[in-house]
Amino acid sequence: MDHSEVKFTNKTHDNILKMELYGHRNDLANAFLELQKNEEFIISFSKDTHIEITTKPISKGYTLEYVCKNIFQENIENVMAVGDSENDISMLSLVGYSYAMANSNKYVKIFAKYHTSAFDQEGVVMAIKDFLYRKSQK
């Protein structure tokens, strides 16, 4: 079976919220460009070998905003988010305290207000400590 073949369809199913494609980034590049033509989806590289496809408006940012507003009644400006992939951009661009991991690509880092170490270097722990410090200074 040839795993590099990708077939596209305009058929959608109302219950599908998320799909993922895995492969080499070069192999996925054509699929990425083709999928971006469909305005019903949010398409992003999650990792170099992984494309995430979600139905609009579903995204990490949308979900975080919904949870803050409807469950915790918290202003999103008071919330932190840590991310390292393109599928984190929607979340990083919404919160008041956004952290990009050191292993993030340059594009993701543009959307973060702050930066932290890589995941395997306790970057999440460092981001939480920084967030708590910044909140204590207000």
Where are these regions (language model features)?
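Conserved acidic, metal-coordinating active-site core of Asp-based
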Residues: 1-91
